[in-house]
């Protein structure tokens, strides 16, 4: 609640970003202490700093932006953001990244209790599914219609980001990616086919960009994945069976 109130004040220009971050720091420190109290050996920050579980991470990449729009979801109209490619996708480790600050803070809190910190990031497929399938945009300002080049650069950007986290002491990353479960939903698959793609083609994109993203990962870094049927305001986004994409 404290973070919600501080974020509302920040959005209304009532407080500076540093003041919002101080509130986030305080509440995340309390969360980590509670996780340890309940016996967790790997702790997270609960993504307390994020507005969107995936977009706030993806905004760390150069060449990526978002589009605001209204969309009818689960029986009601909602104001949402979707990701867009606006240039060459890359990750610059020399920039000051909010997500790296978040990691450094979490790692420091975890070290106070002798437990490990886990960093959660959204997967590379989310860039593809928002731009090409959710928004239905066929080309990009930098790549044109060359989706192979897009896949290659997204993979390289993830490699650079993973290496940056490693250099900051991260040894456990969880990649969250609901894009796979878009493709179990017959309604969404029909939309994909209406755009001129096939389910097999899109799944092939996902396999290749996800594989590329993990190339050259440090041998002693643990990388896990998570996917589900989405959770938008307490309701699933997709319906179907996982075995249709397994």
Where are these regions (language model features)?
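Domain-level signal for soluble alpha/beta catalytic cores
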Residues: 1-246
